[in-house]
Amino acid sequence: MTNPSPKLTPMFEQYLRIKEDYPDALLFYRMGDFYELFFDDAETTARELQIALTCRNPNAELKAPMCGVPYHAVEGYISQLLDKGYRVAICEQIEDPKEAKGLVKRAVTRVLTPGTVIDDANLDAKEHNYLGALFWNQDAEAGAFAWVDVSTGEWSGLYSRKLAELWQWAQKMAPRELLLPEGVDTPAMATLGTTQTVRVPARSHFDLKSGTERVMRAQGVADLGSLGLEGKPELVRACAALLAYLAQTQKQELSHLAPFKPLNLGRHLIIDEVTERNLELFHRLDGRKGPGTLWHILDRTLTPMGGRLLEERMHHPWREAGPIRETQQVVEWLFQDDVRREALRTALDLVYDLERLSTRIFLNRATPKDFIALRQSLSALPAVRATLERPANPEGTYPTDAETSGDTLPKPLSDMLSAWDDLADYADLLRRALTDNPPHLVTEGGLFRPGFDPDLDELLDLAEHGEARLQELLAEEQTVSGLPKLKLGYNRVFGYFFELSRAGADSVPEHFVRRQTLANAERFTTERLKELEEKLVSATDRRKTLEYRLFQSLRDTVAEARPRVLFMADMLAHLDFWQSLADVARRNGWVRPDVHTGHDIVIREGRHPVVEAMQGSASFVPNDLRMDEKRRLLLITGPNMAGKSTVLRQTAIICLLAQMGAFVPAREASIGIADRIFSRVGASDNLAQGQSTFMVEMMETARILRQASKRSLVILDEIGRGTSTFDGMALAWAVVEELTRRAGGGIRTLFATHYHEITSLEGRIPGVHNMNIAIREWNGDIVFLRRLVPGPADKSYGIEVARLAGVPHSVVQRARELLADLERTRDAARGTNSAPSRQTLPGLDLPSKQEQVDTIVAPPPCSGVEHPLLVALRDIDTDDMTPLEALKRITEWKQLWGTTREDRS
């Protein structure tokens, strides 16, 4: 029989009992001034944070690995762990150790996860931090994706009958955590990047009945109609999962969330994650942020709220002319007046993150420093307002042909001023209450100014003037009692006392109480001395306790102002967003585009804003571009490195900027509003999921062909290059034909290709128009002119580009020989007008190594009339077809073909 293990200490028993409830989190266990971690948690944390790993003995036989971090610096350590994808459970002492009988009671007060943090140390100031939830109802063939930023209280979502569309939005919004019902797998097509998937029980988190109650309770409504959730049970379930997870991690029901706003796709230009990546809106193609992205060019915001609004507008530009033109009016008004704009920037620079400050205050997670930041922000509001009310300065204006002059306030700004709230009452309260440099922790005291609270003033006076009070009492007793030789003393045993010589002790008044007799002296106390002593000894503790109570009261009062603070935060965010667009336009010489509801796109001297910023405006070559009913698909040819991809990207970016309401990098621009922008540019693969570069290219092309409409803008770069020459050319040719047939006249498309044979489609298919990037041959070299000119390119100059890239001379020379032979073969075949010939390449004469090349011939023209079955097959979306729907469609197709069972019998 084995001996039982020695009993664990009470502390370790408590630790293990709490840890059992949080097996997937690192448990930060509060012990005095430190958070300690034990066992596997300690080893993991020590490794990830590069801190010392020690050990502690839970009993006589066991040694437990241990590490710890000081409580006053814990935020920085937790931030590192969250960035690495860990969850952290914070276990606090929930009773005062001085009053505890035995082991101090402890409990987990919150669980920190990447998608639920609200502290600045764990957040990027100008980026949203989303928690997402995706739910698909297989029976109803419908689903939803919802997301929330806990730090600001904003949340939204969308309902769809296409599962693929929901996953596209999950990729686009890139939540830090994505909640999925247990048993649901991530599809192979989804590339979630840094998003962590979290499986949660469907019954508890995604349940419709309890979820409906949870959503209505959190939003304070009696029905779902006011939230836009009526008749969308799948979206209700996704929202409910978010709320359940937040309650589970935050250990409280969150009531700070703003009213839920479903995303109205009909109001916004849709840009999927692939297009955002290809256009390098937020990240470069190598995944890094900063220089090389459109965000880096546009971000001249000064407040975190303005930065996040800029991010939102880049994700979701407008599709309606009204909001676009309103934004343009304000941007132009600020663009005109440099003095006003700089004054506005100076005032906005004093404003902190009002949204996140308000959230932390409301959730009782704010530090004294947060209140100081709020005070400074509110104090800046009058200065911001004054910049809008001041008359225009003629010396600082920039003349334009604007519809708004410097003295005419655009309607969005006049509406803003009419509703402006300086929050002067709360700014005054915070000025009167708090010192300029309060401590970081509420429990340390020293928070409040003198004069804010009479009781606190008395305690502060005692702490500061206690010795003087004692001397005043001594002088009073000396005078009133007639004891001029009376002295005041102190020791740790008796505290404060009066002392007289043995000879003078006989004449003390009756209110003197003897405390101690010495050889040559007597020591006394009085009621007043005891009262003063008690006040002095307890003044520090009483002051800290009172200040903590006053701070909580102040927090509750300021929390009531959250709706007003958020209202002004939204105003400041828009002002910051508008001035940022104006400042960027002024600095870079951008112009206000004409945005209309037609389909034409006309750009004069357009530029790529990112490339121009990196190269310098002097060396960047601008280009003109026109798309209309006769030029709906532009075939762009030219050599590598000539600038085809730049032209494609800059056109898409100019359209995106225009629909944000921003100015654009061009001399002049007229943009027909698009409903979606699609981009298939550059090579990429997904090897982890078994998808080659060509497979990814075809999947993205398929999505474009399924989803693009007549109002869409499509940019395609070198479709078909990842396979054999003829396969690739055939695919590219077929894609061009399909794009010109779609949507009753074709889809607006920029199509860059090296398959020069496709340029023969101009004149054969309406709407196809050839353009090329011009080059010049000079003394055996090629000079890239970077100019987009009419007509097709005569050749690709790939060998010359290879030579410029440093490919060895022998390889370049051999390539020239092979090219010359291939061209002779092609020309001979065309000259004899015979059947396609085959020619063995020179130098490859071994039978087993022969490569044969067919002469390129134009494919047959497509028939003017398609069979109805072909039309039905082409338009079907197999990704979202159910088995029942498939059977129904097959029956329809058989009828179209004329081979029903009845016909065969």
UniProtKB/Swiss-Prot annotation:
Superkingdom: Bacteria
Q: Which UniProt keywords apply?
A: ATP-binding, DNA damage, DNA repair, DNA-binding, Nucleotide-binding
Q: Which GO terms describe its molecular function?
A: ATP binding; ATP-dependent DNA damage sensor activity; damaged DNA binding; mismatched DNA binding
Where do Polar residues bias regions lie? 831-840
Quote a single Gene Ontology cellular component term: cytosol
InterPro entries, per database record: DNA_mismatch_repair_MutS, DNA_mismatch_repair_MutS-lik_N, DNA_mismatch_repair_MutS/MSH, DNA_mismatch_repair_MutS_C, DNA_mismatch_repair_MutS_clamp, DNA_mismatch_repair_MutS_core, DNA_mismatch_repair_MutS_N, DNA_mismatch_repair_MutS_sf
Name the segments for region: Disordered.
Answer: 388-410, 826-847
| One GO-annotated biological process of the protein | mismatch repair
Q: Which Pfam families does the entry link to? A: MutS_I (PF01624), MutS_II (PF05188), MutS_III (PF05192), MutS_IV (PF05190), MutS_V (PF00488)
| Binding-site list for ATP | 638-645
Entries under PROSITE patterns matching the protein:
DNA_MISMATCH_REPAIR_2
Give the UniProt family note. Answer: Belongs to the DNA mismatch repair MutS family.
HAMAP family recorded for this chain? MutS
Write out the function statement from the record: This protein is involved in the repair of mismatches in DNA. It is possible that it carries out the mismatch recognition step. This protein has a weak ATPase activity.
Q: What is this protein called?
A: DNA mismatch repair protein MutS
In its UniProt entry, the species of origin is given as Nitratidesulfovibrio vulgaris (strain DP4)
Q: Which gene encodes it?
A: mutS
